[in-house]
Amino acid sequence: MAYNRNIKARIGYSHYAISFSCLFVLFAAIPASAAEDFAKAREKLDASFAENLDSLAKKCDELGLKDHAAITRSWMIPRFSGRQYLFLPEAKDSVMPKTGGSDLTQKWYAKFQEHRAAQADGLFELAKNESKAGRPARAYQLLHEVLRENPDHAEARRILGYQKVGIAGWMLVGKSTPPAPGRRAHPKYGWGPGKYWRHETPHYSIATSTSAKQALELGEKMEELHALWRQAFFSFWTNQAGLEHRIGGGREALVKEPKKLDVVLFQDREEYVAALKPGESKIELTTGIYLDKEQTVFLYAGDETRIATWYHEAAHQLFQEIDRFPPEPGNKGNFWMVEGMALYMESLARHPTSG
């Protein structure tokens, strides 16, 4: 399959950037006047924010706070056309000073928080306006950006389905269990008791023969992808009415969550091939696979360069199981669309929290 290697993307710890030619088609439906109004409001908001951050950075220079000045200056994200910027909320503010920091550090952080909170409030108003104007996908993305600036923005957290959990910070509502060794032999893969781990996240059920640590890391990656997919394909899983209900204070969730998505991580490629070969004669040609008949993503550890493949296969699962496509979509036609949407998510790339 041809893949446009000119596609560029940047992702960071708290935000992701995606670029894909299809994006322009998606945005083409927005009337020019509406797009211009949003662009002007956004430009004005960002200009004020940038000015405040610049003043704070200069003050840090005067006080010899070199590291604080660098964080402040790098906070504004450079934006490039053809890229979509998506944000992953953190449980807590990643730049919060450690307890016992100097008085100057605390004063810097207080002012930094003040400017970011003002930006968050402005973004929140933009989000409400966009939703009301019939552009809920953009509103939903903006709500995530609100939490980059103010992780404790209570209304944005509520709308997006978060709850505060003690010192752990903000967490998605949904049952999660830490990785635990299997008590009985696995019914499918021959793993003995205590030789594999199960891990539940809000949206995934993970089984692996690797380790508890890798189960936890895989769960984090899958939840990140899930959050980004929901931002990129908002209309696929919910709608404007649902978002307006939440913004208006409604308690009904944006969507009734389907069953958790199954992911299996094998210890290595050899185990992956041996386990799946009986049902997939050409499995050795793959580096990860989503099998619709199993409703499961199968991956293997030991090669972190394959993370794009993980995203690709997990994206197929999201499209297939969130709204149940017909079995094996693309076999009889529109294969380009099925693969193109998975490649869209494969193009994700991380971008640092600050700058």
Feature roles, as predicted:
Residues 17-29:
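Bacterial N-terminal signal peptides
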Residues 294-355:
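Zinc-dependent metallopeptidase catalytic helix centered on the HExxH motif
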Residues 60, 79-81, 150:
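Alpha-helical junction/boundary sensor with strong preference for TPR arrays
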Residues 96-106, 113-118, 131-307:
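Non-catalytic architectural context of zinc metalloproteases
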Residues 42-43, 74, 144:
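Alpha-solenoid helical repeat scaffolds
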Residues 33-43, 87-114:
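Repeat-mediated protein-protein interaction surfaces in helical alpha-solenoids
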